[in-house]
Amino acid sequence: MAVEGGMKCVKFLLYVLLLAFCACAVGLIAVGVGAQLVLSQTIIQGATPGSLLPVVIIAVGVFLFLVAFVGCCGACKENYCLMITFAIFLSLIMLVEVAAAIAGYVFRDKVMSEFNNNFRQQMENYPKNNHTASILDRMQADFKCCGAANYTDWEKIPSMSKNRVPDSCCINVTVGCGINFNEKAIHKEGCVEKIGGWLRKNVLVVAAAALGIAFVEVLGIVFACCLVKSIRSGYEVM
């Protein structure tokens, strides 16, 4: 009876963890989608460590939700095969999350390097491409910055007029405020340092969250293994 009572407690805790996994899965998907939207607005393009991280987060979130569903079915029916499958796949998810967390830490400086290269490349296209101009203007206005390293970077763009910066560099944005500008009226700090630092910080936050979720998943694996052992022993946990 004591064993059966203990296993009922384990089963209840497993249900609680499964609900937590579902919540974490939804959270991961939301964070991944949000990060992807942010990166799409900061012109980080191509299959780079920075741009692939949101995709990995979304994939892990979807997979975690499916695995939690399998675990719920296995716990309800006390099905040995389903619980084994749940434990194995949860272990795989945990390994992916730990790997993603490590990758996020290792490539935190790479994210800034990618952003710097892309930002300078797109500055060249600013006068030629309205879509690029719109993205750069939004970034400069939102982060209160101007140019890559500083506002003088705009002077190096051949197609830009002399003594001119985009209007989005102005402290108080008005039409034509960037023409023959006064240095006191524009943001002097570069966008690479401001936005790149923000990106690195958020990569580390996501990495820390992944490690936290992985710790909870360890508990899920332990409880699942306990339930599997109980099922094999023939105890009634209902």
Swiss-Prot record:
Membrane topology, as annotated: Multi-pass membrane protein
GO biological process: cell migration; cell-matrix adhesion; endosome to melanosome transport; epithelial cell differentiation; negative regulation of epithelial cell migration; pigment granule maturation; positive regulation of cell adhesion; positive regulation of integrin-mediated signaling pathway
InterPro entries per record: CD63_LEL, Tetraspanin/Peripherin, Tetraspanin_animals, Tetraspanin_CS, Tetraspanin_EC2_sf
Glycosylation sites: 130, 150, 172
Spans within the Extracellular topological domain: 33-51, 103-203
Keyword Glycoprotein: yes
Sequence motif Lysosomal targeting motif, residues: 234-238
Pfam families (UniProt xref): Tetraspanin
GO terms, molecular function: protein-containing complex binding
Keywords: Cell membrane, Endosome, Glycoprotein, Lipoprotein, Lysosome, Membrane, Palmitate, Protein transport, Secreted, Transmembrane, Transmembrane helix, Transport
Processing and modification events after translation: Palmitoylated at a low, basal level in unstimulated platelets. The level of palmitoylation increases when platelets are activated by thrombin (in vitro).
Compartment annotation: Cell membrane; Lysosome membrane; Late endosome membrane; Endosome, Multivesicular body
Function: Functions as a cell surface receptor for TIMP1 and plays a role in the activation of cellular signaling cascades. Plays a role in the activation of ITGB1 and integrin signaling, leading to the activation of AKT, FAK/PTK2 and MAP kinases. Promotes cell survival, reorganization of the actin cytoskeleton, cell adhesion, spreading and migration, via its role in the activation of AKT and FAK/PTK2. Plays a role in VEGFA signaling via its role in regulating the internalization of KDR/VEGFR2.
Other facts: Lack of expression of CD63 in platelets has been observed in a patient with Hermansky-Pudlak syndrome (HPS). Hermansky-Pudlak syndrome (HPS) is a genetically heterogeneous, rare, autosomal recessive disorder characterized by oculocutaneous albinism, bleeding due to platelet storage pool deficiency, and lysosomal storage defects. This syndrome results from defects of diverse cytoplasmic organelles including melanosomes, platelet dense granules and lysosomes. Ceroid storage in the lungs is associated with pulmonary fibrosis, a common cause of premature death in individuals with HPS.
Family: Belongs to the tetraspanin (TM4SF) family.
Self-association state and partner proteins as the record states: Interacts with TIMP1 and ITGB1 and recruits TIMP1 to ITGB1. Interacts with CD9. Identified in a complex with CD9 and ITGB3. Interacts with PMEL. Interacts with KDR/VEGFR2; identified in a complex with ITGB1 and KDR/VEGFR2 and is required to recruit KDR to ITGB1 complexes. Interacts with SYT7.
Protein name as annotated: CD63 antigen
Native organism: Homo sapiens
The gene coding this protein: CD63
